[in-house]
Amino acid sequence: MMNTSSHLKAQASCPLVEHFLRRKLSKENFDRFIPNRSAMDFDFANYALTQGRKRNVDEVTSASRKAYMTQLAEAMNQNRTRILAFRNKPKALLSSNHSDPPHQQPISVKPRRYIPQNSERVLDAPGIADDFYLNLLDWGSSNVLAIALGDTVYLWDASSGSTYKLVTIDEEEGPVTSINWTQDGLDLAIGLDNSEVQLWDCVSNRQVRTLRGGHESRVGSLAWNNHILTTGGMDGKIVNNDVRIRSSIVETYLGHTEEVCGLKWSESGKKLASGGNDNVVHIWDHRSVASSNPTRQWLHRFEEHTAAVRALAWCPFQASLLATGGGVGDGKIKFWNTHTGACLNSVETGSQVCSLLWSKSERELLSSHGFTQNQLTLWKYPSMVKMAELNGHTSRVLFMAQSPDGCTVASAAGDETLRLWNVFGEPPKTTKKAASKKYTDPFAHVNHIR
């Protein structure tokens, strides 16, 4: 038997002993492996020891059956041979929003909105003029839709569904060529073929006054900016009327050489967009319209369209963004930065662009068109990918108006129908009732007709 000194000398010179002595310092290496009973699958172990290895050696099978059995065994995990478990499965890491990599964090995907392809309601509009240069439809903030049919203006209360006639214009003054609600939805301006503009209080159903002297021919476009009523005529002039004073004409914009067929004030009331039959779009700065030099009155002049521009729409989520649409021979929707005057994008639609409306809650734009499809097209902005095409009209869709909640769109066409479309979805849910905007009553100091 080896003595103690020789035994220690042998241990010191043996590399295996030295190796095992160092392994004791490691937490990853062990000299014994004891199965973890709580992690074992005893049912499978019993099956594997008793039945799992039985094979019928005389069984004759086809190649296809062998392949099937192989796939089945893999799917059912039948060929596993490991029975003992020496460690538990690692615990799942606790999620931490601030430490997880971006690709592991859950991504909120907004479900795609369902857009009905058919109009939800169709109303008759007999006698509506099929004239690209007129504006005969408007939806007020009091949820009343106004439409001009020949010499008569009708009001449809969308809340109650009732319809009534507001006024029939005398034959020598009519027909009606434009209508536009005040911002509080209580008063209506009516432009006429004889160059006059009538102002009506629709609560009491009475005429308040008549504006004369601003134009020499029909008034085809109107736009309110609080107490200022802006009118555009076939004579190419744009006139600002302060309806609070007797001599209402306060400013005249000179720039268009042909009929003004589109007028829109920005939400702030600081800029006015005008479109004309001269294929020109002007941006006017309300703070500098009184310039003594008429050739410098406009802020910007856009001449890129190749046809009349009637469709104008200010963006609700980007104050300086304006969308414009060209008529037959152009068919383009253009986007402008009205701060710099730059054209941001131009999209070919393939047909006459009659009207444009922005969604109030989504980054979407709705356009109405003429020949060949007479459709409404919903676009995703800024990609300008088509989201939907709405068909139903059999004539060019000249007029569109948006409900106060921004969800429903009314369209009117030369086919003498008025259609309602649920194109912009449901109104956004709010926890608190939004404070309504307060507008100055434009007729606060007017108590007579002139």
Curated annotation (Swiss-Prot):
Keywords: Cell cycle, Cell division, Mitosis, Nucleus, Repeat, Ubl conjugation pathway, WD repeat. WD repeats lie at residues 129-166, 171-210, 214-251, 255-294, 304-346, 348-389, 392-431. GO terms for cellular component: Cul4-RING E3 ubiquitin ligase complex; nucleus. Disulfide bonds: none annotated. InterPro entries: Cdc20/Fizzy, WD40/YVTN_repeat-like_dom_sf, WD40_CDC20-Fz, WD40_repeat_CS, WD40_repeat_dom_sf, WD40_rpt. It comes from the Eukaryota. One of its GO terms (biological process) is cell division. CDD domains: WD40. One of its GO terms (molecular function) is ubiquitin-protein transferase activator activity. Pathway: Protein modification; protein ubiquitination. It is found in: Nucleus. Coiled coil: none annotated. Component of the anaphase promoting complex/cyclosome (APC/C), a cell cycle-regulated E3 ubiquitin-protein ligase complex that controls progression through mitosis and the G1 phase of the cell cycle. PANTHER family: CELL DIVISION CYCLE 20 CDC20 FIZZY -RELATED, FI02843P. The APC/C is composed of at least 11 subunits that stay tightly associated throughout the cell cycle. Binds to GIG1 and PYM. Part of the mitotic checkpoint complex (MCC); interacts with MAD2 and BUB1. Belongs to the WD repeat CDC20/Fizzy family. This is Cell division cycle 20.5, cofactor of APC complex.
